[in-house]
Amino acid sequence: MQVNDLGFVASILFVLVPSVFLIILYIQTASREGKKDS
């Protein structure tokens, strides 16, 4: 299966960008919850 380099990079970014965004949001909310508890 021949994969276009541009398509390959685009598909990786398509998965990575939302994942990183969600991870950052989760870390921010988790750190806020931690500050509330202490």
Swiss-Prot record:
Q: Which InterPro entries match?
A: PSII_PsbM (IPR007826), PSII_PsbM_sf (IPR037269)
Q: Does the keyword Transferase apply?
A: no
The GO cellular component terms are: photosystem II; plasma membrane-derived thylakoid membrane
Q: How does it assemble?
A: PSII is composed of 1 copy each of membrane proteins PsbA, PsbB, PsbC, PsbD, PsbE, PsbF, PsbH, PsbI, PsbJ, PsbK, PsbL, PsbM, PsbT, PsbX, PsbY, PsbZ, Psb30/Ycf12, peripheral proteins PsbO, CyanoQ (PsbQ), PsbU, PsbV and a large number of cofactors. It forms dimeric complexes.
Q: What does this protein do?
A: One of the components of the core complex of photosystem II (PSII). PSII is a light-driven water:plastoquinone oxidoreductase that uses light energy to abstract electrons from H(2)O, generating O(2) and a proton gradient subsequently used for ATP formation. It consists of a core antenna complex that captures photons, and an electron transfer chain that converts photonic excitation into a charge separation. This subunit is found at the monomer-monomer interface.
Q: Which domain of life is it from?
A: Bacteria
Regarding the membrane, this protein is recorded as: Single-pass membrane protein
Q: Primary place of residence?
A: membrane
NCBIfam families annotated for this entry? Answer: PS_II_psbM
Which key words are in the record? Membrane, Photosynthesis, Photosystem II, Reaction center, Thylakoid, Transmembrane, Transmembrane helix
Residues passing through the membrane, by range: 7-27
> Which organism's genome codes for this protein?
Nostoc sp. (strain PCC 7120 / SAG 25.82 / UTEX 2576)
- Biological process (GO) annotations? photosynthesis, light reaction
The UniProt entry, under Pfam families, shows: PsbM
Q: What family does this chain come from, according to its entry?
A: Belongs to the PsbM family.
Give the subcellular location. Answer: Cellular thylakoid membrane
Q: What is this protein called?
A: Photosystem II reaction center protein M
For the keyword Metal-binding, the answer is no
